[in-house]
Amino acid sequence: MPQHPGLPPGHPMAPGQHPNAHPGAGMVQAVHPGVSAPGGPQVTQGGPMMGMPPGAGTTGPGGPVQAHALSHLGPAQAHLFQQPQFAQTFANNPQLLQQHQHQQQILRQRMMFQQQQAAQQQQHAGLPVSLPNGTQGLNAAQLAAMQANSGMRPVNLQMHLQQMPHGPQNIQQQQQQLFAMQQAQQAQQAHQAQQAQQAQQAQQAAAAAAAAAAQPGQHTPQQRHAAHPQNMHDAQSVTPQPQPPPHQGSSTPQSNPPQPPSSQPQQQPGAAPQPHPTPNPPPQQLPQAQQPGQQPHQQPQQPPQQQPQQQQSQQGQPQGQQQQMTPQEAQMKAQQTQNQAAMMMQQRMGMKGTSILALLTFAEHLSNFTSRGEAQDLLYWQAFVDKFYSPVGVLRQGVYNPQAGSKQFEISTPALARYYLTQFTSGIRQIQMLVEGARERDSPNGGRIVESRRTSFIYWFTNESQLFTNGTLIAHFDHNNKIEMLDIVVMNHTEYLPRSQLQPLELSEQKQSPKVSKNLGKRAQQKQAQQAAPSLPESMVTANGVPTAVMSFLEVAETISHMQMLFQFSQQNPQFSPPEALRNLVNTLQSQNPNPGFMPSPMNPAMQQGQNLRGPQMNGPNQFASPAMAHLGLPPQGSPHLSAHPSPAQSHLAGPPGMVQQGQMQPNVGQATSASASPQVTNKRRRASTVKVENDDTGGPEVNGTATQGAAKVKASPRVGGKRQKGTA
């Protein structure tokens, strides 16, 4: 069927239809499922055939790929570019033509990126990763277009990684490696983009200078370009360019031989115009060229007027790219900050538990000690302190006394080695440290704090006895996991003896039967008494729960810790002797803090009053009385040593000041326990209560004033009779 010659090229019956060209405007476009148009859906997740590239089934950049590249455009856009009347519109509107060319260039770059991504997916088993060797061909414009389109970002790896036969740890490691590689690639691409922008600006400046030097004879390429707009647009929309630089123009039509931009001949002033074989000018210079409707006398003035516009239009694109790179750089910086925070968090998570492990290692070394001699033991403990304690570390060792309670002694690092040695030379054979329920937390100074609510120390002594101490422990570690302060609070202690030492004592305490003791003679009983009775072994610890030598060391160490200021002052001033250093230090402290109330001088009455609050000096107006009346400072009820709660009946016995009670002038030994003492009057004595017997001569007692005649003598009571017998006898 012959085709109608008047139909537009987009119609199916139009002449010169290319077999791979786009269908007409009224036909439905058969777009590949993996190909996306600017207004169509975007493929962001691979389907069952994710390993295949989006353009599967197409050939290379030589033949049918041209039609495939044309299929990236929507139906309206393809039909628009094939209509001749729109070419005239572009020629009349240079800005619209430049915008259209820029969009067309971005579409070609998108197609190339999809092809490269498909090749990378085939190389990496369908995973759309961005490796350094896969994106080396991208230039600045392609990078900007790729990053501007959010739909062209890499596919989410979560579903694919879940299907891979790797453990969670391997997946996390792979994600971290891929993330690091992507960051490095982004940094490299940003650097390349900056270099490309600089080169582009230099080339555009050179092109602007060449355009300024051109003469009016340049209207011939524009006329030829206006005469053949359809062929130029077809060639621009069909021919793909793998790496098109921004200054490079479109390809030459088929009727003209292709020539590089550097080989374009520059026409001299006054030269005749060439009507036919002239290479196409760059596309960025076309909008600024002379329009067909202008007069010839305006042509010499046109290039100087259009040169600033050309430079502005050429500089517009690099400025837009620089503005577009600014948010990207901010995003990269934000990602770097997040990565640093994540790395610090991972380091913190990795360090969590290391302080507890260091404390358990400390306890293990303390428990595994075996004595090899005092000299070698001291070297061992010095190495022990250097390994686990900070140079400024402190041990706060606690002791417990049932009467006084808990107390702590502070030992600095230089004395710690001698402290541990003193423990093992004072009768302790082994020390076992048990830490229960240890918890670790961060310290404000950047270290770690390990706290245990229940910590036990078990001491084995040379006499087979054991001592158990229970308390709490708080250990402060620095960033090197060394102890800055080890705080041990002892709540109680218990001493245990082995059963083998208690069995002989139990046998000796068994009582013998009376029959056996009667049968034995007195000599045998004396021999058994003379035999040494078994007794408990002597305790090797004091009431504080530590050996005597250790307690003495703690007391001396506490004194030395309070004298550290004096030691430092003496070391800073070696010209002073110890007494002179002490005297100068006291004078320095007095000058810095001029308050004599805090100086412990015997001539200071305020300190004496503070030390003896119950003295006579603190008893009001009597403090200036005569020394002979010092006893008047006592309470009016008498000495507090005699009665803390005196009887109210004794209040009337208190005389005026200057008089002494009678009972206090005489010895009152047995006054409180005497049977004849009155409960109300302290100094009154009573006669002994005895039965009065009269008329002893008559031989009988009186009954109601009448003596009984001939009656038998009544026997007195045992109590009274005993006394009477002694008196009568």
UniProtKB/Swiss-Prot annotation:
Residues 38-56, 286-300, 307-341, 655-671 have a biased composition (Low complexity). Disruption phenotype: Leads to a reduced growth rate and a delayed conidiation. The keyword Signal does not apply. It is found in: Nucleus. InterPro entries: LIM-bd/SEUSS (IPR029005). Residues 1-69, 207-341, 505-538, 614-729 are annotated as: Disordered. Keywords: Activator, Nucleus, Transcription, Transcription regulation. One of its GO terms (biological process) is negative regulation of transcription by RNA polymerase II. The keyword Transcription applies. Transmembrane segments: none annotated. Interacts with somA. Belongs to the MFG1 family. This is Transcriptional activator ptaB. It comes from Aspergillus fumigatus (strain ATCC MYA-4609 / CBS 101355 / FGSC A1100 / Af293).
